[in-house]
Amino acid sequence: MLLVGFVVLVMAVAVLCIAEYSSLPGNVGRVLTQEEQAQVIADNSPLTDYVMLSPNADFPRDDDITKITIHHMAGNLSLEELGSRFSDRDRRASSNYAIDSDGNVALYVEEKNRAWTSSDRENDERAITIEVANDEADGDWHVSDAAYDALVELCVDICKRNGIVEFTYTGDESGTLTTHRMFNPDTICPGPYLNGKLPALAREVNARL
């Protein structure tokens, strides 16, 4: 009887796993053709330089996009390296976009889908999440000027396409600009340097909306 119960349990888990994988969009977790990549970029930010769509997401998101949430990579990863990490189902992590230290932009989860980024489902249902590379480790977790400038450009683009008419930084989760540390007391993400730039980021973005 115990053996039968164990077999039934294993079969149930297998069915759930198969259902989870079969529910993924066909363009997720693989290298896209040029035509597929062009279509994905057309449906998201035209600033995108690299695409590797992660399976670690909810398809689609349940809420309208009303926020942008900033994170740091806690390292100077390439877009390909971060994409490889986000392709690992065991990590259960992803972001919508990332920016490397040269200012290049990657798309890992399409905007219509919820990335698993901020330790808060409610926020991520409403937010486009962006990881920014650090060109210096520890300390202030500095980010390059190129990465910061690209962040401004990407935030402007996201706001314009999604009808965010005012980009507000309030220092808490009530603003349209939020950060990882607002939802997880155990992290300093996005680091002291970038966190200190957020009021200026909001002003620069608003000046262009």
Predicted features by range, described:
Residues M1-D124:
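N-terminal catalytic cores of peptidoglycan-degrading enzymes
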Residues L2-G5, C17-N44, D62, G139-L209:
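Basic/polar, cationic surfaces and motifs that engage anionic cell-wall
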Residues N56, L82, S94, W116, ...:
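Second-shell loop/turn segments in exported
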Residues T69, T129-E131, T178:
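Soluble periplasmic/extracytoplasmic beta-strand elements of cell-envelope proteins
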Residues N76, E136, P185:
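Feature marks short, surface-exposed loop/turn motifs that line or immediately flank catalytic pockets
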Residues S84, A106-W116, E136-D140, T168-G175:
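Noncatalytic linker/hinge segments flanking ATPase motor cores
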Residues Y97, I130, L151:
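Divalent metal-coordination and catalytic microenvironments
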Residues I128-A137, M182:
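Cell-envelope and extracellular/periplasmic
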